[in-house]
């Protein structure tokens, strides 16, 4: 028999995939039964888990949403999260993106749909996160090019990192600039200024991989 490669997700043609958003999906594992608020599926594969909290309840916070995903679900239904790369926590006004392994303090708001947009505020931030990070085309791009798993032989093997929106747009622009420079043979392009602590190392990692595959 000749081996062949099976692509579960078609990253090049978004319309070739089946996208589903499921509310209160019931997951059973062992004796446990859990119902995440929202799950996003691509071709039957859970790729993003979303936990929502009611903003009118003072005791319900996005920190509680993080605990629900990264502690309770990870403990009780780990099989669901095995391929679920992204996680969103929200109370309607505060919304943040991370992974199922991201510590709470590193969850980050997604404030823009396109790079030239002004940063969203308040209730608009949830709409911005959905359109900016979770639309079919955008979530495919993030899953393909902006999720990083460190070498488990050198770092904690439970680490998983997803880009922040400034890293996403910076890597995109840098890639376009470098490709243009190569095509025109100008020797220019790829210049980037980032403030201290903005995550330039990961931006370069995301960019380097994309250029290597170009």
Provide a role label for each language-model segment.
Residues 1-214:
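ATP-dependent helicase/translocase motor core
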């Amino acid at each position: 028999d000749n081996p062949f490669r099976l692509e579960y997700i078609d990253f090049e043609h978004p319309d070739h995939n089946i996208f589903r958003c499921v509310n209160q999906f019931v997951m059973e594992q062992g004796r446990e039964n859990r119902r995440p608020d929202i799950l996003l599926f691509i071709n039957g594969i859970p790729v993003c888990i979303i936990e929502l909290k009611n903003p009118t309840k003072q005791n319900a916070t996005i920190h509680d949403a993080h605990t629900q995903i990264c502690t309770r679900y990870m403990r009780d239904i780990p099989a669901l999260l095995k391929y679920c790369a992204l996680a969103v926590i929200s109370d309607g006004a505060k919304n943040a993106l991370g992974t199922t392994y991201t510590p709470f303090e590193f969850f980050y708001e997604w404030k823009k749909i396109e790079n030239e947009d002004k940063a969203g505020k308040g209730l608009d931030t949830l709409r911005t996160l959905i359109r900016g990070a979770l639309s079919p085309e955008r979530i495919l791009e993030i899953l393909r090019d902006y999720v990083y798993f460190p070498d488990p032989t050198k770092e904690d093997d439970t680490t998983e990192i997803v880009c922040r929106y400034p890293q996403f747009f910076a890597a995109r622009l840098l890639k376009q600039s470098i490709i243009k420079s190569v095509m025109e043979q100008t020797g220019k392009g790829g210049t980037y200024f980032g403030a201290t602590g903005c995550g330039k190392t990961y931006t370069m990692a995301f960019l380097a991989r994309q250029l290597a595959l170009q």
